[in-house]
Amino acid sequence: YKNPLIRTRRKEFKLSNGDLTSIYNSRTFCLYEDIDRIIGQGLAKGGSLKNAIVVNKSKILNDNGLRNKDEFVSHKILDCLGDLMLSGHRIFGHIKTSQGGHQLTNTLLREFLLDRSNWEFESLEGKEKNNKDDNYPSPIAVNA
C-alpha cells in the first residue's frame, strides 16, 4: 500500500498449534477516500469505526487507533485463513503473499484444487489431535 500508515508490512504466522490469539481481533481496514466507492458497490453494510479501521492520509480516524501495531497485516492473514477454510478441508502448506485479498486467495484456492497433482487427501486417524482442531473437517488436503 502506498499509504504511509499501512505501507508494506510483514508477519510470519504459524497455525500449526491452532492458536489464533495474535490475529483474531484484527479489523478490516479501508482508506477514507474509498468509502463512497465501497458503499456504491454494495459493500461495507454494517461497517463502522467499531469494526473497521479507516485511514485518512496519515491519520487513523478510529478514536483508539490500532489494537496492535500489526493489525493491518494480521487482518490480511485472518482473511486468507478464512478464505482457505471455504475449501471444506484443512490445508497443510506454506503461503506467502503480497497485498493479498479475497480475490487473490480465491484464485489461488481454485487453481490449487483444480490440479490433483498439487494435493492429496490424508486421514487424521491414528494421529494425535489438538483439541483446537476439532472444528476442522476430517479430510486434509496437503501439498504433494
Language-model segment annotations:
Residues 1-144:
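Short acidic-hydrophobic catalytic motif
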